[in-house]
Regions:
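Conserved, well-ordered alpha-helix/loop/beta-strand core segments that scaffold catalytic motifs
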Residues: 112-116, 136-140, 146, 150-153
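Conserved beta-strand segments of alpha/beta enzyme cores
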Residues: 5, 81-83, 189-191
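Active-site-proximal beta-strand/loop segments in catalytic clefts of secreted hydrolases
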Residues: 61-64, 85-88, 114-118, 153-157, ...
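N-terminal secretory targeting modules
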Residues: 1-59, 71, 106, 235-239
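Charged helix-capping and loop-helix junction motifs
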Residues: 128-137, 174-178
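Catalytic His-Asp segment of secreted/periplasmic serine-dependent ester chemistry enzymes
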Residues: 157-239
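Catalytic nucleophile-elbow at a beta strand-turn-alpha helix junction centered on a G-D-S/GDSL motif
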Residues: 55-71, 88-91
Length: 239
């Protein structure tokens, strides 16, 4: 039912994750990303009224790619009434812990989930595909249990991560997870948006230089590509 409580196991896991990440930060290109699970959108969420009748609210759940999207193309979100809930540096573990606060409690009709870049970059520890995939599946299941539709999206391409050059096999890990997400979405009849295929470039499977300056985060041109793809999927899902 809507607002159903998490199990004791879920709560214990969430508490452990929260304690593990408390106070952690990531330094990259002169910027400091806060990795804690504090309510970064607490004020915005509190100020957001519940949707009116027939309103089809859409929340975008993500990391700095989503956060940067809102900052780079604010009109895309404002004009469509979309709500961005991206936090730079975060992994799927942290998404899962704040999913109730930043998605379920906002009563959207639909959530768009984009995850795993920072998992693969090992922002909060060694990468385990099964665990990252499981976190994403858990978010889908939580959404469905609360009558929220879901659009899953691919992790964007990246040949490497400037803040963690020790990761040498990012393209392989991204491709593997994306294939698994696509299969899961098809099996469970979940809309799936493939940003990856439209944005990948070269034999090293990098994010197309036309769409990025640092190899990971999209520029305005990159977000143009993403908007065209996601808008079609949202319209189809909510019609």
């Amino acid at each position: 039912e809507k607002g159903a409580d998490l199990t004791e196991t879920d709560l214990s896991s969430a508490k452990a994750v929260k304690e593990d990440f408390a106070g952690q930060t990531l330094e990259y290109r002169g910027e400091t990303y806060e990795l804690s699970l504090a309510g970064s959108y607490q004020t915005e969420n509190a100020a957001l009224a519940q949707p009116v009748k027939k309103e089809k609210r859409v929340v975008f759940m993500g990391n700095s790619i989503t956060e940067g999207w809102v900052n780079t193309h604010p009109d895309f979100f404002k004009s469509n009434g979309y709500i961005g809930r991206g936090i730079g540096g975060q992994t799927s573990y942290q998404f899962l812990v704040r999913f109730r606060e930043d998605v379920i409690n906002l009563s959207p009709a639909l959530v768009v989930i984009n995850a795993a870049t920072n998992d693969i970059a090992e922002n909060t520890g060694a990468y385990h595909e099964d665990r990252t995939f499981g976190n994403i599946v858990s978010m889908v299941e939580l959404a469905k249990a609360n009558h929220i539709k879901v659009i899953l999206t691919t992790t964007l391409p990246a040949a490497a991560f400037g803040w963690n050059p020790a990761i040498k096999d990012a393209p392989q890990k991204i491709a593997s997870l994306n294939a698994r997400l696509k299969a899961y979405a098809q099996t469970n009849k979940i809309p799936f948006v493939d940003y990856y295929s439209s944005m990948v470039s070269g034999s090293n499977k990098a994010l197309n230089p036309a769409y990025t300056k640092d190899g990971v985060h999209p520029t305005s041109e990159g977000y143009d590509v993403m908007e065209n793809l996601i808008q079609q999927a949202i319209n189809k899902t909510l019609r």
